[in-house]
Amino acid sequence: MTTKTKKILLICALTLSAAVLLFFGFKKGVELYNAKNADELFTAGDYAGAREWYEKNGSAEDIARCDYELDREAYEAAAAQLAAGEYDAARLAFEALGDFEDAADRALECILFKARALTDAGSYTDALDVLAALPEDHTGAQELTEEAREGLYQQALAATYECRMDEAVMLWNSLGSYKDSDSLLKRCMSRIVSMAAGTEERINYSPYAGRDVGDGILYWHRLGLIYVPKECNADTRCMIFYPGGYDSALANSYYQDYIYAGTSPNAIILYMYTNGFYDIESHIEDAYRALEEAALENNVFLHDMVVCGASNGAYTAVNTAAYLYENYGIAVRYVLTFDAGAHWAHTDKVLTPEQCDLAAEAGTEFLLFEGAGIGMNKSAIHTMVRHGCDVTIVLCRNSGHYGIIYDAIYKGMLDWVLGNGEQPTDANYTYIPLDITSTYPE
C-alpha cells in the first residue's frame, strides 16, 4: 500500500469517525431537547403529551408521575360532576379510577347522594332501587333506606285511603314487607275484587226515617243503623257501637242521639242492634262486613277505626280490636267501653293474653269509662295491662249506667275520638292511665 493510499484511508476513517460523532451528538442533542420539552409539557399540565414521550424514552418514575396527575385531573372532574348533581356520570368516573386515593368510596357516595336526591323528590321506589347497590353497612345507607321505605309506605297509604287501588297495589308490591304492608296489600286486592263484583247487600235503598241527619244520612241495615256522611273522603273514619244487654234487640235511641245532637262527624258509624254476647267472633265478622259494604259504596277504605261498647257490649268491643287486627290488619285506634257488664266479671268473654298481645301490637288505646272501684283489681283489666295494652280508666263522676253513656255523647268524648275536637278535660272525668304497679281507684 502506497503512502498516498494510506493517507486517503486515514482521511476517510477520520471523516467517518467525525460523522459518527456528529450523528450521535446530534441524536443526543435531540433527546436532550425533547426531554426538556417533555418536562415543560409536564410543568404546563399537558400530562398526556408528556406521558407519550416518557413512554418511549423516559423512566417508569416519569410515567408514574404523569399517570398520577392524569388520575388527579379525572378525580377532580368527577368531584365536579358529583357537586353538579350528575350522579351517574360521577359514579362511572370514580369507578374508572380504580384504587386511586378514595375513588372507590366516592363512587359509593355518588349512589348515596343520588338516593338522597330521589328521596327528597318523593321518588321513593327509585331511591330504594338505587340504594340496593350499596353495602348495608355503608354509612347512612340504613337510615336513608328506612326514610325511603317510610316515604313509600305513606305514599301507598295515601293511595289506599283515597281508594286508588290499582296504584296502591303497585306501591305495596314495590315496598315489600314493611310494618303492616302485607295485610294492607291483601285488603287492597280484596277491595279490587269487591269493586268489580259489587256489594252483596246494598245499604242505601232505605234511608231511616226518610230524612237526612245533620251532614249525613242514617241508613237501615239488617244488623243495625249506619250513618254515612254525605261527602266522604280519605279522612273519613269509622266506628262500631255495640249496645248493652244479653244480646237482645234494644231500643237504639241513645245511639242516634250522637247524630241528632248535630255534631255530624266525618265518620261512617254502625250502630249494632245487638252485641253478640253469646257469639262474639261471628258478630264482629258480621259488623265488619256491614261496615265494609258501606265503605265500599261510598269509596272509603276502612281505617282509623273506633269501637264502642256499653254494658255487655264492652266485651265485644275489646275483642273487636284483636279480631280486626289479626284477620284484616285493621288497627283500631280507640276502644271505648261504658260501664262494662257485671264489672268485667265475665272472664270467659275478655281478651286472652294472646289477644292482648295483638291489641298491643296494633297500638289500640282502651278507654274504660267506669265508676269508682274498677281497675287493676279486675282480672280482665289486669291481664290487658300486664300484656302491654294501653289502658286508661276514665273515672266518671256521673257513674250511673246511662249517665256514663250520655256524658260521652254530649260532652265531646265521641267527637274527640272521631277527630272532631279536643279531649274533654272537664271535672266530670278523671283519666287514670294504668300500668302494672297501678291500684284500683277508690
Regions picked out by a protein language model, each given a short descriptive name:
Residues 1-17, 21:
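N-terminal Sec-pathway targeting helices
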Residues 186-236, 426-442:
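A domain-start/cap signature at the N-terminus of enzymes
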Residues 235-245:
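Short beta-strand element of the alpha/beta-hydrolase
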Residues 296, 303-358:
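Primarily recognizes the serine-hydrolase "nucleophile elbow" in alpha/beta-hydrolase
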Residues 251-269:
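Short amphipathic alpha-helix adjacent to the substrate-entry channel of hydrolases
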Residues 334, 339-414, 418-421:
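The feature captures the conserved acid-bearing segment of alpha/beta-hydrolase catalytic domains
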